[in-house]
């Protein structure tokens, strides 16, 4: 896992979901572990898109349930660029 991407994702998650930094682990599920509802998830995806200058289609966003999944998706998109 790219540590730089993870740290940026972690920072965004902490800010968007107002959770403690130590609760944001690669395995953390946005809904179950971090308390995100559907609106939080949409806002989180938008923040990730802005930070990493990528587009996350709705179908892809539905499959990003954990911090690790977000990092993996961003790594994949950046590799295409």
Curated annotation (Swiss-Prot):
4'-phosphopantetheine is transferred from CoA to a specific serine of apo-ACP by AcpS. This modification is essential for activity because fatty acids are bound in thioester linkage to the sulfhydryl of the prosthetic group. GO terms for biological process: lipid A biosynthetic process. Pathway: Lipid metabolism; fatty acid biosynthesis. InterPro entries: ACP, ACP-like_sf, PP-bd_ACP, Ppantetheine_attach_site. It is found in: Cytoplasm. NCBIfam families: acyl_carrier (TIGR00517), PRK00982.1-2 (NF002148), PRK00982.1-3 (NF002149), PRK00982.1-4 (NF002150), PRK00982.1-5 (NF002151). Carrier of the growing fatty acid chain in fatty acid biosynthesis. This is Acyl carrier protein. It comes from Crocosphaera subtropica (strain ATCC 51142 / BH68). The gene is acpP.
């Amino acid at each position: 896992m790219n540590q730089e991407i993870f740290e940026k994702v972690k920072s965004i998650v902490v800010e968007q979901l107002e959770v403690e930094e130590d609760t944001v682990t690669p395995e953390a599920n946005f809904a179950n572990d971090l308390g995100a509802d559907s609106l939080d998830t949409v806002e989180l995806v938008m923040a990730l898109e802005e930070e990493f200058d990528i587009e996350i289609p709705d179908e892809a966003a539905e499959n990003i349930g954990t911090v690790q999944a977000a990092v993996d998706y961003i790594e994949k998109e950046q590799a295409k660029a």
